[in-house]
Amino acid sequence: METLYTERLTLRKMELEDADVLCQYWSDPEVTKYMNITPFTDVSQARDMIQMINDLSLEGQANRFSIIVKETDEVIGTCGFNMIDQENGRAEIGYDLGRNHWGKGFASEAVQKLIDYGFTSLNLNRIEAKVEPENTPSIKLLNSLSFQKEGLLRDYEKAKGRLIDVYMFSLLKREYAG
């Protein structure tokens, strides 16, 4: 997995040394509100998550980058592909930031770079995002990056013990301006 760079950010493979700071973010109910995890209570949960995703990355099934601010070398969140379907050239995108980093354009900058990586390096044809209807910030982000809302998937998946509706968004390689 290569390291990616934007004007303000470095996106690199998640490492076990990121567990302490990621545990802080992933233990915040506001950060995990729309993630399919319950808030973490122990750093070992973050270590396990990092190891699981890195194992999936080795198999080409998923990947996740730590998002780092170049100026401060601070890990502020993660982004990546939760599921990669190489046979069909598609992947599901995911992203999260610590609450104190919201509203600064970091998610947009990181996800834009991730999209470029997906279409160029991973040779994807389609990038998908599943978003809960109440997750307005994520919907705004996807709209700003030219994702198309395809529709509502009713009772589509379990999150925190209950079936939820999700919007399906997608961006196709031929639509991507790059």
Curated annotation (Swiss-Prot):
Gene3D superfamilies: 3.40.630.30. Pfam families: Acetyltransf_3 (PF13302). Keywords: Acyltransferase, Transferase. One of its GO terms (molecular function) is protein-N-terminal-alanine acetyltransferase activity. PROSITE patterns: GNAT. Residues 9-173 form the N-acetyltransferase domain. GO terms for cellular component: cytoplasm. Its EC number is 2.3.1.-. Disulfide bonds: none annotated. The keyword Transcription does not apply. Signal peptide: none annotated. PANTHER family: GNAT FAMILY, PUTATIVE (AFU_ORTHOLOGUE AFUA_3G00765)-RELATED-RELATED (PTHR43792), RIBOSOMAL-PROTEIN-ALANINE ACETYLTRANSFERASE (PTHR43792:SF9). This is Uncharacterized N-acetyltransferase p20. It comes from Bacillus licheniformis.
